[in-house]
Amino acid sequence: MVPEINIPPQLETRIAARFPAARLVSLHSELGDAARSRHWRAAHSGEARIVLGTRLAVFTPMPVLGLIIVDEEHDTSFKQQDGLRYSARDLAVYRARQNDIPVVLGSATPSLESWANATGNGGRERYHLLSLGGRAVPGAGLPAIRCIDTRVDRLHDGLTTPLLSAIESRLARGEQSLLFLNRRG
């Protein structure tokens, strides 16, 4: 399961190349009704061995379900806010428990709830914590992080002077800058 609708096409290619003998289908809201029905039936019959999808995929019946993977488990996109409210991540954990199969909750920045379930209190861990031994790119270091107190460095059009200076110096060197904002729209 993936949090965003734009992820399945990229991941679908990689998974299909890695598991060429297994039929893979995707399930997400961008599929037309006919394609979604075809993919759902393939999963339900067991013809499709791998289902890749957004939170909708958690409801797909699969006769020989053996593993559930939730990529970026911390992402709020797994929570349905309208109508019937649910957390697809929590439903995936429940389904795995009911089917006595493993579930992998993957994240470089796990939710506090998952972190607490993995690190536990006095030996009461509910999840088994696995960590990567190194960086995805060998030799890559961690980025430099600087916290800026906006009570001291005032905002100018939403950006602080140190941030504006850092962007200007990168642009002067012909480099790019990417700003992540914590809101949508």
Residue ranges and their predicted role:
Residues 8-10, 33-37, 60-61, 76-79, ...:
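Switch/connector loops and helix/strand junctions flanking conserved nucleotide-binding motifs
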Residues 44-50, 55-104:
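SF2 helicase catalytic motif II
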Residues 1-4, 25-27, 176-182:
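Conserved RecA-like ASCE P-loop NTPase motor core of nucleic-acid helicases/translocases
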Residues 3-4, 29-30, 56, 73-74, ...:
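Short, ordered loop/turn segments at secondary-structure junctions
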Residues 14-51, 59-65, 121:
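Conserved motor-coupling elements within RecA-like helicase/translocase cores
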Residues 89-185:
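Conserved interdomain linker/interface between the two RecA-like ATPase lobes of SF2 helicase motors
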Residues 25-33, 75-86, 151-157:
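Flexible beta-alpha connector loops of hexameric P-loop NTPases
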Residues 1-17:
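Conserved Walker A/P-loop ATP-binding site and its immediately adjacent core
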